[in-house]
Amino acid sequence: MFKKLRVFVASLLALILAISLSTLSSPAAPKGDPITLGYSNWAGWWPWAIAVDQKMFEKNGVNVQMKWFDGYVQSMETFAAGKIDGNSQTLNDTISFLPGENGGEVVVLVNDNSAGNDQIIADKSIKSVADLKGKTVAVEEGVVDDFLLVLALNDVGLTRDDVIIKGLPTDQAATAF
């Protein structure tokens, strides 16, 4: 009698388990047009590359395509032209968008808070920001790097006019140095 009861209970549990597992579903396949998001070479945006590598969008049924840009400015120009749906960029660059660009609609998703990792790279003769006076400084103009340079110069009583600015995309700065 107990043997038949154990077989019945085991069979019933197996049936319940099978029914439970059959109702689990994998995420739905992404539907509709994809959302295309741009990103470029900055550590705060590398989680996008990890998400792509680990197929996180597909696993969660989200139809997202990430577009890599070699240059930060190129990514902003592409977004401003409406050729991608969103872009990873600094808040001050987002704020500076003209109202007519990209239909005038901007949504900000904060995915990183910088704690001051930006710095000026210089040779050993430059001991302080004040030593940059009269020197050539390479910076990507009109973006956050330029803004931070101006702040650093202002902190020591200098302006952009006190240095010789050489416009250079950020991704080329280390090579040029």
What annotation goes with each model-predicted range?
Residues 29-174:
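Short, glycine-/small- and polar/acidic-enriched structural segments
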Residues 1-34:
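Short, low-complexity disordered leader/linker segments with a strong preference
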